Amino acid sequence: MSVTIALDAMGGDHGPQVVVPAALKVLAEMINVKLILIGDRDLLNGLVAIHRGELGTRLTIQHASQKVEMDEAPSQALRAKKDSSMRIAINLVKSRKADACVSAGNTGALMAIARFVLKTLPGIDRPAIVSALPTIRGHCYMLDLGANVDSSAQNLYQFALMGSVLASAIDNIKEPSVGLLNIGSEIIKGNERIKEAGRMLSQSHLNYVGFVEGNDVYEGCVDVVVCDGFVGNVALKSSEGVARMVRHYLRESFQRNYLTRFAGFLALPVLKAFHQRMDPRRYNGANLLGLNGVVIKSHGGADITAFAHAIRIAVIEARKDVPQHISAHLEPWLSEGQVV
């Protein structure tokens, strides 16, 4: 199945210097994929000129006269940046000229513009940011990772529904297990919102296993972890910091003297496998779940490898038509929670 992905080439900390090589990398790896680079036409033409012959019509450029700055207020980006590379990328999804879009730009602006242009799916109040996280047993999906810092029980219920459908669609899991992130597994733990969301989910047809704690996330106890955006973002950033610390200590330990360096040389294959498994670039690319279209948010500081992975995520979710898949499964479940 051929898919077309629109790329915000001007977004992120590195802009076209990362987006263009990442696009070329993906096109070299994946067939039946077309990419649209959106940004400064002259700049982008210069970066892709030497590859024109081999790419043919698989890579096209669409000019954008504006870009959304990383520190720009979402309201300003929405009102004043109608010809920005971010806005045009989302517009292409809306007009079905692209099957998905990817941006490393300002998260708040991306969410505001995407929600304004694409709208949310019927029965969904707020989109959520969801991403795969590595676990001992493979990976799990965690949402929300920062789109909503104050979520109601109803929002959490909807996040659980969407996360379950996503895991089922992408990983072909018949009944994905779902857990609510909490300060304890006992039903008496947590604030009233968490308790109410737990009651709603326990009465649903989802494979809801109850509350899970932070240490359960990376043990792979559940397929889908649900939380509000404040908690999810703190948990995500904390885990990224721990991963960097572990890599630092390993590197430091193997460089203490000649003996440890030799031990490090012998352990190199194991260390490479460890680094690859824990490499955050392999998990770059978060879905703005709950919209009428596929929008993938890349980390703002992503390098070529990381941004290429975000494009691959967009291709997979576009081919699966995740929004349509969610819509088809949501109505009976939403009726259970009386949230339509």
UniProtKB/Swiss-Prot annotation:
Name of the protein in its database record: Phosphate acyltransferase
Record keywords: Cytoplasm, Lipid biosynthesis, Lipid metabolism, Phospholipid biosynthesis, Phospholipid metabolism, Transferase
Compartments where located: Cytoplasm
Complex and partners: Homodimer. Probably interacts with PlsY.
A Pfam family recorded for this sequence: FA_synthesis
Pathway: Lipid metabolism; phospholipid metabolism
Disulfide bonds: none
GO cellular component labels: cytoplasm
Similarity comment: family membership: Belongs to the PlsX family.
Organism from which the protein derives: Nitrosococcus oceani (strain ATCC 19707 / BCRC 17464 / JCM 30415 / NCIMB 11848 / C-107)
HAMAP family associated with the record: PlsX (MF_00019)
